[in-house]
């Protein structure tokens, strides 16, 4: 037998293994075993690893994008876009050395005492008028708080003696005011002189003016009941529609209520502005429409009432519109988000319309004059100078569109005084008047444009030979005239009142007759949105012809606006009679029994005008205001020598000579 094999040698070990249980028993069961992540990863197939890497990369990308979105939201919530913050820092005034009894302050006191003797307050009784930076606890602006902090001890030292100042019926104690002393002078006393200049206590309303007041109250009843604080009333469905969400109708009607002497209604509207009008909203607004309606409405109401609340709101809103001017060409974008400061062109084009970019100058210039912030005026005047220097015009006539990137006219060869170009011509004249007739470039452009209209756009209809303004497209004339063009006779008459050639008045009279006939020849007595004129003798045709798509009426003001100017300049009472006829037609065919007035679809059907269920803000902001002024026996009520109306009928003062 063989001996049993020897056991194998023990394995060589050159280390010692030590196990520390730390009071726990060692467990080597499967439930306790763990493999390293790397070993697990290596055991996965290539496909599995690629899928996991893709998912991780996707999640990281989503997290990065979310962080950017969150940062933008915080930026919006901060209250100012970066561009606006930069602008505010640049214009923050330096605190002057305190002077208790300077000659300038004594002069302001003299002005106050003199104006109190002559001024009769009109408006809501017992209005508590606050300084610009103390509108309400919730509504105090950021720049007001900064100015408050900047005052510090200087204001406390200056207000050791309590002095009571009576200002337009309100009692203001200096230690309660938060603005700088020189700012009080600029924002309160100086504009108060202007307010007393453009507004004088009128005579009691006559019968026709009472008719306008009744119409306004009926419109306002519908707005109060069904659309209070919203943009526009839908009177038939008894609800509202929103455009900007900023109480557009209410702001547009503020100065109308003041002019009509509706104290209680004005007081209620002012309360809404003080407590509810907040511009820190993530909403896009159209630069042109919001400027002429909101900024213009606030500025004019400030001048009429002397209430600094409206100037504070106007300054805040103006700053929020400024990012629209940050384009390569300085031609502003059409839209701007007033909460984030993001400005842009419409989605379908990079163009702005010429009327939009050249019909905001009156408002921004006046805002600069009141606040001392030059950027407002500089931005809009740069646009005016740029348009002046451009080629592509035809004897003073301008195309309808301009590119915000290149700063050049687009769609050349098309000329109209209707939509997209109309108020360019209006604001040439009105800026010249506003500035005290010193800016000759504006006057030259206006006069040249009127000559261009005569040469290229004027024709006469058949059979009554009505003079009308048509359109020109690449050398081809179209006998089409928007109701918007009916602003022109009034603008021509205004120019004659301020010394322009007398033949402008002849054209104004002729065009006024045409605009009246655009109303008179319709079965409802109301003008269509667009009219076409018959240029050839036909026994069975009227002068004014209307296509089915153009026969609606939006309660527009242009005809009664021009009637107001023609009556002021000529004092011919037929213009008052024509306006009264139009008011009666509004009452008969557009009035909604429950409150409000509605635009209509068919001015040619007196039996079924078909309400469109919308009352535009300009009906109470412009149409009824111009009718009230037209019927006034007092030609000094908002005199054409002391104020100029913006294109939304908001009166602004003519600047006194320096």
Swiss-Prot record:
Disulfide bonds join 486-515. It is found in: Endoplasmic reticulum membrane. The modification Phosphoserine is found at residue 102. GO terms for molecular function: calcium ion binding; mannosyl-oligosaccharide 1,2-alpha-mannosidase activity. The active site is at 289 (proton donor), 422, 529 (proton donor), 558. GO terms for biological process: carbohydrate metabolic process; ERAD pathway; mannoprotein catabolic process; protein glycosylation. It is an enzyme of class 3 (hydrolase). Pfam families: Glyco_hydro_47 (PF01532). Residues 1-50 are cytoplasmic. It is a single-pass type II membrane protein. One of its GO terms (cellular component) is cytoplasmic vesicle. The keyword Secreted does not apply. Its cofactor is Ca(2+). Residues 123-142 are annotated as: Disordered. Residues 72-658 are lumenal. Its EC number is 3.2.1.113. Its main location: endoplasmic reticulum. Ca(2+) binds at residue 647. Belongs to the glycosyl hydrolase 47 family. Involved in glycoprotein quality control targeting of misfolded glycoproteins for degradation. It primarily trims a single alpha-1,2-linked mannose residue from Man(9)GlcNAc(2) to produce Man(8)GlcNAc(2), but at high enzyme concentrations, as found in the ER quality control compartment (ERQC), it further trims the carbohydrates to Man(5-6)GlcNAc(2). This is Endoplasmic reticulum mannosyl-oligosaccharide 1,2-alpha-mannosidase. It comes from Mus musculus. The gene is Man1b1.
């Amino acid at each position: 037998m063989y001996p049993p094999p020897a056991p194998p040698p023990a394995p060589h070990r050159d280390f010692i293994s030590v196990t520390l249980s730390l009071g726990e028993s060692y467990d080597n069961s499967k439930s306790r075993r763990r493999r390293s992540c790397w070993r697990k990863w290596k055991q996965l197939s290539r496909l599995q690893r690629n899928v996991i890497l893709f998912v991780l990369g996707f999640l990281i990308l989503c997290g990065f994008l979310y962080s950017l979105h969150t940062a933008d939201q915080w930026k919006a919530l901060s209250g100012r876009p970066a561009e606006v913050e930069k602008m505010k820092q640049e214009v923050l005034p330096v605190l002057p050395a305190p002077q208790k009894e300077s000659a300038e302050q004594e002069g302001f006191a003299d002005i106050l005492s003199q104006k109190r003797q002559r001024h009769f307050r009109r408006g809501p009784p017992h209005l508590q008028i606050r300084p610009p930076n103390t509108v309400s606890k919730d509504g105090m602006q950021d720049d007001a708080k900064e100015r408050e902090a900047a005052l510090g001890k200087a204001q406390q030292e200056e207000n050791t003696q309590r002095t009571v100042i009576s200002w337009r019926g309100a009692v203001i104690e200096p230690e309660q005011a938060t603005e700088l002393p020189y700012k009080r002078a600029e924002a309160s006393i100086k504009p108060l002189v202007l307010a007393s200049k453009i507004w004088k206590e009128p005579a009691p309303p006559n019968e026709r003016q009472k008719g306008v007041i009744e119409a306004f109250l009926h419109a306002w009843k519908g707005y109060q009941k069904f659309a209070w604080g919203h943009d526009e009333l839908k009177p038939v469905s008894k609800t509202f529609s929103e455009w900007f969400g900023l109480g557009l109708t209410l702001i547009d009607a503020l100065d109308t209520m003041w002019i009509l002497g509706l104290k209680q209604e004005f007081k209620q509207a002012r309360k809404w502005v003080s407590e509810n009008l907040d511009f820190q909203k993530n909403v896009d607004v159209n630069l042109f429409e919001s400027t002429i309606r909101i900024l213009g409405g606030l500025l004019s109401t400030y001048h009429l009432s002397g209430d600094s609340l409206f100037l504070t709101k106007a300054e805040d809103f103006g700053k929020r519109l400024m990012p629209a001017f940050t384009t390569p060409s300085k031609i502003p974008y059409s839209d701007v988000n007033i909460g984030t400061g993001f400005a842009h062109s419409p989605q379908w084009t990079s163009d702005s319309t010429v009327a939009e970019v050249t019909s905001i100058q009156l408002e921004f210039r006046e805002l600069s004059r009141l606040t001392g912030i030059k950027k407002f005026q500089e931005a809009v005047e740069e646009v005016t100078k740029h348009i002046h220097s451009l080629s592509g015009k035809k004897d003073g006539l301008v195309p309808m569109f301009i590119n915000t990137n290149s700063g050049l006219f687009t769609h050349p060869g098309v000329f109209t005084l209707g939509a997209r170009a109309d108020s360019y011509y209006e604001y040439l004249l009105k800026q010249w008047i506003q500035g005290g007739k010193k800016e000759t470039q504006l006057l030259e452009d206006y006069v040249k444009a009127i000559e261009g209209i005569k040469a290229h756009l004027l024709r006469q209809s058949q059979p009554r030979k009505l003079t009308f303004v048509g359109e020109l497209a690449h050398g081809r004339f179209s006998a089409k005239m928007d109701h918007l063009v009916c602003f022109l006779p009034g603008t021509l008459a205004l120019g004659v009142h301020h010394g322009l050639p007398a033949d402008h008045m002849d054209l104004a009279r002729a065009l006024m007759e045409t605009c009246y006939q655009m109303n008179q020849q319709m079965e409802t007595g109301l003008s269509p949105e667009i009219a076409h004129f018959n240029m050839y003798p036909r026994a069975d045709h009227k002068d004014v012809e209307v296509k089915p798509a153009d026969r609606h009426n939006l309660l527009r003001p242009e005809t009664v606006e021009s009637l107001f100017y023609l009556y002021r300049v000529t004092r011919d009472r037929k213009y008052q009679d024509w306006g009264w006829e139009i008011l009666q037609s509004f009452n008969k065919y557009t009035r909604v029994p429950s409150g409000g007035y509605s635009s209509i679809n068919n001015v040619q059907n007196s039996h079924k005008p078909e309400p469109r269920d919308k009352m535009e803000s300009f009906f109470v902001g412009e149409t009824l205001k111009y009718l009230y002024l037209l019927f006034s026996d007092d030609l000094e009520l908002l005199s054409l020598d002391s104020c100029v109306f913006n294109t939304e009928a908001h009166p602004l003062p003519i600047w006194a000579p320096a």
